[in-house]
Swiss-Prot record:
Gene name per UniProt: glnS
UniProt GO cellular component terms: cytosol
An example Gene Ontology biological process: glutamyl-tRNA aminoacylation
Protein name: Glutamine--tRNA ligase
Source species: Xanthomonas euvesicatoria pv. vesicatoria (strain 85-10) (Xanthomonas campestris pv. vesicatoria)
Subunit and partners: Monomer.
Sorted UniProt keywords: Aminoacyl-tRNA synthetase, ATP-binding, Cytoplasm, Ligase, Nucleotide-binding, Protein biosynthesis
Subcellular location: Cytoplasm
Motif ('KMSKS' region): 292-296
Amino acid sequence: MSETLATDATAPAEKKDFIRQIVREDLASGKHTVIRTRFPPEPNGYLHIGHAKAICLDFGLAAEFGGLCNLRLDDTNPAKEDPEFVVAIQDDVRWLGYEWAQLRHASDYFQVYYLAAQKLIRDGHAFVCDLSAEQVRQYRGTLTEPGRNSPFRERSVEENLELFARMRAGEFPDGARTLRAKIDMASGNINLRDPALYRIKHVEHQNTGNAWPIYPMYDFAHSLGDAVEGITHSLCTLEFEDHRPLYDWCVDKVDLAGHPELLQPLLDKGLPREAAKPRQIEFSRLNINYTVMSKRKLTALVEEQLVDGWDDPRMYTLQGLRRRGYTPAAMRLFVDRVGISKQNSLIDFSVLEGCLREDLDAAAPRRMAVIDPLKLVLTNLPEGHTETLQFSNHPKDESFGTREVPFARELWIEREDFAEVPPKGWKRLVPGGEIRLRGAGIARVDEVIKNADGEIVELRGWLDPESRPGMEGANRKVKGTIHWVSAVHAVEAEIRLYDRLFSVEKPDDESEGKTYRDYLNPESKRNVRGYVEPSAAMAAPEQAFQFERSGYFVADRRDHSAATPVFNRSVTLRDTWAK
């Protein structure tokens, strides 16, 4: 993809978090003329809502300051990576409203990393170690005890170069040797106790095939990847704060900007020379109650078939949230509301739901749908009577226009809108009582039809002919208004009533001997058959609506069609979880 300025989908008011303050100071001082950021996911799973914060920050920051943001796929662990995830990651970033300046892969730089490792060996900063993984752990020490030097730490430069070349040639089995940095085994930061830079892994890579039997470790590849691309501000979450000294060590000891010969493999590929020294800045990760965001746990939910796949609308993956009906605008608004800081906090799930309601209240056309149907027959209308009524598509925005809604003698109404024995304060239908049928007139129930089991199967009533739209009688006051659909014209639809996947605020809490599996909400999904007005059935997949008085729904992106409509409840009209 050609290099273009990153573009944000919105133009928010100036934000004053600490990261933006750093960027403003760097630009004002002339330290940087253009800022460069990157979003560097590993393609070993689907992105989740936590990644949305990083995406919006990385791409949004670049857009805000007229800079560039790369999408770099950190594909240094081929055993866990899959092209399926590569495609999904790009889809998610674009869905959120962002475009990358360049699409890069860590594997694009494998030869650069190899040359950089050779430089570290020549400079006396790296050595080939024969200790096993278990022995390395024993030598590393603890938080209170220093580590011990590897017996192979003082190998000569020549021997290290030869052994590293043989590692590269594939002569040794997996785990036989590693290349380690030579830093300080007594450091109080365990990350600096001679960490591994390369490991042997005879695994085919999705981009490079079997060309490499050795692969760089994350800290080494990540820091040099930023340096190669000239990233000015490398943004990551707080758990990488202790890794920053190693990040800086790798950048400084290799010094790509000062050793352009190391970049020759990129120039040979036609890539530009952009190397510079990046700065790592950490911010708090996104934590939301009623969720789990561990990739391991999300994978288990899918593999154990506790959910219906990675894009199950109850999942916290971006694919799942999208299918649920969450919008890019709502996701960006949520990230803005949460803000950027160094303080870890737990965000209430209702904040996310509130952002979706706020967006859809303004953006979603209104439609009528009946989820639990009960027939109402208006007996004073002629048999076969039908007519067409004009309805506004949005009560707050005339630009949405109007639509035609069929009306008939036989209607479907919500079963819960009728009570044979009403509770105190009831404002809907009762025997002999009146109700306003949305946009159609005032109706009364005269007769309740039941089956042999005593269940109500039909209501029979009367429509006041003087209360039709535009008539004086339409202004007569009645206690309540209900929605309806024409039984003759309505289209049967599958309606999936989704709710939160977990029933407790902290499903990760295992203090009582339970796991997140024990806290799955049995009411998180209910499939029902209902009826929608014809114009809703004709919607394109991913079209959102407010089903009046019911909630916000979206036409399922996978299963919906005009012939077999499927709607997912995105969020209720009001917070039903409020305490």
